Amino acid sequence: MDLMDLKPTSNTVEVKLKHPNTGVVLKNEDKTDMTIVVFASHSKEYKELMHEQTNKRLKDMQSNKKTDITAQDMEKATLDVLSKITSEWNITYNKEQPKLSVSKAKDLYDEVFWIKDQIEEALADSLDFTKA
């Protein structure tokens, strides 16, 4: 066994969006699967974002600013992270295939709330990253 065989082979995770009730993969009008690609938790991009958020919280605490964290704060932080780790997508939203932006991703993840769960589940499952 070589430890390099257990090194991640990709810095991203592709999530095929599934109907929240039936589990069927959702399709765009052109018959392609609806997908969202996010940076994996071991990626440089993901880690930088987490460091940025943690540093902000630490700085706020050290300067005696707000130290209480509410459920709303946690939800906002989750939306912020998910929208910023989204690297690409192929989706139909509001009858169009929108260009990816952090703002559009936040809107999508807020309005179509079950997508967050599918992304978080895919990130948790992304430990299945080893070479065959």
What are these regions (language model features)?
Residues 35-39, 47, 67, 71, ...:
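Intrinsic-disorder-associated interaction segments
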Residues 88-132:
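C-terminal charged interaction modules
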Residues 1-60, 129-132:
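Short, charged/polar N-terminal "headpieces" of proteins
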Residues 49-88, 94:
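Negatively charged, Asp/Glu-rich surface segments that serve as flexible interaction/assembly modules
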Residues 2, 26-30, 42, 70-72, ...:
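Exposed, low-complexity/repetitive linear segments and helix-based recognition motifs
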Residues 10, 41-43, 63, 83-87, ...:
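Generic serine detector
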Residues 17, 32, 78, 99-100:
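Intrinsically disordered, low-complexity segments enriched in glycine/proline and serine/threonine
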